[in-house]
């Protein structure tokens, strides 16, 4: 109603399958759905100005590495190589059997042969600071939002560089076989076989992933470039706030969890102090 949000309409599904439609009335509304679903919810509510644009992330390429001995799959290894920061970071990834099977699929090696002695295999990543950006758009009649992202030529080059550096590290650590997350990519056993990776990493062939999504409701004081002010209040609405990773203006090159928690705490403190 005007410059105020008065509540939210939602549906609750009961254990028996019944659906109940609810309206929750509120004096203040905080949207915390993450960098994909926060902008999608705002867009479905008719709020589009600087909402959903500028999606940022850390595009990530991986290698499944086979060692001559079993490796520990109990947890995600907390090791990280920052020698090539701020543009490339290298580290360990989740390596349970399902993750390994998925990581081995890209090169086209015979499945049973590749997965033999799977407990000798672990997955590692190279993530980049990306110059590209993306968009989140809620489409009429479609339940899930459309998410798109465009890599630049520099991004593709950094991904290839990260893959090669990661391969060099793993061979030095004793790996005997490297499967890159590149469709049809060469399986490498020695350093002198790695040169082909530079040309194999393309937009069409690289099988990338990311877990760090930000920047779809950027915070700041320039209304022409941001979706919310510096404390997460959505422009043109007195009582509507965003308080999640959508606010971070760029992907920071590291896990943004601590930054998100710090910003959310600061925004809550500012809100409570004003009441």
What are these regions (language model features)?
Residues 1, 8-82, 244, 259, ...:
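Glycine-rich loop(s) and the adjacent beta-strand/alpha-helix scaffold that form part
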Residues 1, 7, 175-250, 257:
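A glycine-rich dinucleotide-binding beta-alpha-beta segment and adjacent secondary-structure elements
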Residues 18, 34, 158, 211, ...:
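Secondary-structure capping and boundary motifs in well-ordered enzyme cores
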Residues 19, 39-41, 73-74, 134-137, ...:
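Short helix/loop capping segments that flank catalytic or ligand/cofactor-binding pockets
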Residues 30, 166, 219:
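Conserved hydrophobic/aromatic pocket- or pore-lining residues that grip, position, or stack substrates
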Residues 48-170, 177, 202-215, 235, ...:
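FAD cofactor-binding and catalytic pocket of flavoenzymes
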Residues 165-173, 264-275:
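Internal hydrophobic alpha-helix adjacent to the cofactor/substrate pocket in enzyme cavities
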């Amino acid at each position: 109603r005007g410059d105020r949000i008065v509540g939210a309409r939602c549906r609750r599904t009961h254990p028996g399958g019944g659906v109940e439609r609810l309206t929750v009335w509120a004096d203040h509304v905080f949207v915390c759905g993450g960098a994909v679903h926060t902008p999608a919810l705002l867009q479905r509510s008719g709020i589009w100005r600087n909402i959903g644009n500028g999606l940022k992330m850390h595009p990530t390429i991986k290698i499944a590495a086979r060692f001559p001995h079993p490796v520990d799959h109990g947890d995600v290894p907390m090791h990280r190589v920052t020698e090539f920061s701020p543009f490339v970071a290298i580290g360990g990834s989740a390596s349970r059997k399902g993750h390994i099977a998925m990581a081995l699929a890209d090169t086209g090696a015979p499945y049973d042969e590749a997965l033999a002695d799977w407990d000798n295999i672990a997955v590692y990543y190279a993530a980049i600071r990306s110059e590209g950006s993306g968009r989140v758009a809620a489409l009429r009649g479609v339940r899930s939002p459309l998410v798109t992202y465009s890599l630049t030529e520099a991004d593709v080059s950094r991904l290839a560089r990260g893959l090669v550096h990661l391969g060099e590290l793993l061979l030095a650590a004793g790996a005997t076989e490297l499967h890159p997350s590149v469709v049809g990519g060469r399986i490498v056993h020695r350093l002198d076989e790695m040169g082909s990776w530079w040309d194999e990493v393309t937009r069409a062939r690289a099988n990338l992933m990311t877990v760090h999504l930000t920047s779809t409701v950027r915070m700041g004081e320039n209304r022409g470039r941001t979706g919310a002010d510096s404390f997460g209040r959505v422009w043109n609405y007195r009582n509507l706030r965003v308080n999640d990773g959508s606010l971070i203006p760029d992907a920071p090159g590291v896990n943004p969890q601590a930054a998100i928690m710090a910003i959310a705490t600061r925004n809550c403190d500012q809100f409570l102090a004003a009441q």
